[in-house]
Curated annotation (Swiss-Prot):
Pathway: Glycan metabolism; osmoregulated periplasmic glucan (OPG) biosynthesis. This is Glucans biosynthesis protein D. It comes from Pseudomonas syringae pv. syringae (strain B728a). Residues 1-29 form the signal peptide. GO terms for cellular component: outer membrane-bounded periplasmic space.
Amino acid sequence: MNRRNLLKASMALAAYGSVSASGLFAARALAAAADGEIEHFDFAELQAHAKKLASKGYVSNKQVLPPVLANMTPQQFNAIRYDPNHSLWKDVHGQLDVHFFHVGMGFKTPVRMYSVDPQSKQAREVHFRHDLFNYENSGIDKNLVKGDLGFAGFKLFKAPEIAINDVVSFLGASYFRAVDSNKQYGLSARGLAIDSYAKRQEEFPDFTKFWFETPDKNATRFVVYALLDSPSATGAYRFDIDCQAGQVVMEIDAHVNARTDIQQLGISPMTSMFSCGTHERRMCDTIHPQIHDSDRLSMWRGNGEWICRPLNNPAKPQFSAFSDTDPKGFGLVQSDHEFSSYQDTVVWYSRRPSLWVEPITAWGEGEVSLLELPTTGETMDNIVVFWTPKTPVKAGDSMNYGYKLFWSPLPPVSTPLAQVHATRSGMGGFLEGWAPGEHYPTTWARRFAVDFNGGGLDRLPEGTGIEPIVTVTHGKVQDFNILVLPDIKGYRVTFDWVPDSDSVEPVEMRMFIRTGDRTLSETWLYQYFPPAPDKRKYP
């Protein structure tokens, strides 16, 4: 799962039947880069084609690249630049445009690109050719690059920064990303996840073809269609992409067909990285206080409950499932955008976007699945989140999921109650204000501090009694304290977890705060990994 080495299988499928060339001049005027024969395109036909494809055996079309491309470095790959004079909508002179990625390095699968006239529904393929790219600074001899190699992916631009800063990128398997107002890429989404945490090896479906509706000159939204293929599934996707001033909003219509029985189907998957944060310091022996693309999983359950689950970098793979019916939304959040929290001047974790999923069709019963993997470096994605339907997926099944993706600094919706501001963890068994030095506590314990703010906490009458409601799956909790935090206009709840056995199984913790019968906050969930019994001691 190295974000920089996405080496997945892909497939190029037969094109739709050709039509007459009567619309050739109009099609060329709309997309000068498109040079293929005119074909008919319709989303309903794409759905039918994907369903029919699922009834046939899978055939991989991964190609063997010329050595000059297969062996090039990441620096060489990035140095091959798409020529903006051949952008897909250069002749439209509008607000939107598309550039393509060259194949090479780990991106070996040909992805086919098409330009579509939305009025006539005529489509033409954009074939790979040398004049679409600038090789000058790459050290690559383009004369050694032969044949129609297809493309690796594409990126989208919007005025006023056309050909300067891209706002959306699709590259590798079914991965895609977008930026927000901070103009910094972070976590990724995927078209589909299959068996991410199952007995058999994880499968990475590929987007094998894309169709781009040519926009009007004043249009501000991209419309892109995609064909997905893999050994276990096919899919037809429609992306309506609105690149707004402060966020990117994608409305996705996904039609998925099972080619085989699927043990674990992941809908609207997202992939991120969490190395260390305020509560997890195991891998933070650097100058950086925190290193992560996302710090929490946020969920708005179908029953209205809001949940905050801080992410972990565990010592071994951990899988958590949160049952729900018709979820209102969920996502991976980068809640802290202060430079001082990261001290990073290279990849700018303080500028990373959050990603929120909002279902727009009924998703029924299922679970939000969270996979956390150990990572030793920030280039390895180790967090995966997706929706898994409760009903087992059998060969021949077809499913439709509609949803929106919001790429923004923070999710577009939030609870009216108090939210978790931060989670911290450290040595327990002593009074706050005391620091280890002359002596240590005699009993080992682990302390947790959870800060809440918002939701009117700063407007509670003086003397209001606040009660933390805490449950744990094993061990016991004690030594509660509730502290006012004026700097965040909220409260801090601290407590100690004390083991009652030698078990090293993860402790599932759950907490919210209330006053009387009134709930004041969202629900905090946390997974703690106790040390081995012989490590439960102080110096």
